[in-house]
């Protein structure tokens, strides 16, 4: 089940590669899982219908100025973040992505991160996997450097204890 959701999520990432072409108005974003102040030119993007599996929450934010996107996905799962991160890294490898090392634990947190580069070397991503029992959060920063996405995520406030890592 998790493998299917991760594959569907990966397909959603690929479908979102053109995220800079779908502008939406900038404003603070809030949902059942988190709130996030959208600073600068960061804006929520529309997700393609059918790109997100049932019972999964996903939203994409993009900044033309930073040349980056942030994809946040929350799925119901009781898998440990370590196991989920390894499954996801293996799935990216099977799809031909170049995963740079194994997922590593973020010090002092039940959260893991890894990076990958697309097969054509045009898309770089930093992936964070975290959760606490009933949900897993996957936060992917898409773009060359990741600094703009990390700066945006510093403002994220989780509504579920330890669902997201501290950025």
Locations of the language-model features?
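Soluble non-cytosolic domains of exported or imported proteins
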Residues: 33, 78-82, 143-150
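Stable alpha-helical elements in mature extracytoplasmic
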Residues: 38, 84, 88, 148-152, ...
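N-terminal "mature-domain start" segment
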Residues: 26-54, 106, 159-167
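Hydrophobic core
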Residues: 14-20
């Amino acid at each position: 089940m998790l493998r299917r959701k991760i594959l569907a999520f990966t397909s959603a990432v690929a479908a979102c590669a053109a995220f800079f072409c779908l502008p939406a108005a900038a404003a603070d974003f809030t949902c059942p899982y988190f709130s996030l102040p959208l600073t600068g030119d960061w804006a929520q993007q529309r997700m393609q219908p059918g790109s997100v599996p049932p019972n999964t929450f996903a939203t994409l934010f993009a900044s033309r100025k930073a040349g980056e996107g942030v994809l946040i996905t929350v799925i119901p799962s009781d898998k440990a973040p370590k196991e989920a991160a390894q499954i996801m890294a293996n799935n990216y490898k099977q799809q031909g992505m170049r995963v740079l090392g194994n997922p590593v634990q973020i010090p002092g947190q039940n959260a893991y991160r890894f990076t990958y580069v697309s097969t054509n070397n045009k898309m770089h991503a930093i992936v964070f996997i975290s959760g606490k029992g009933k949900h897993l959060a996957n936060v992917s920063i898409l773009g060359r450097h990741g600094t703009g996405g990390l700066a945006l995520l510093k403002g994220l406030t989780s509504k579920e204890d330890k669902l997201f890592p501290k950025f």
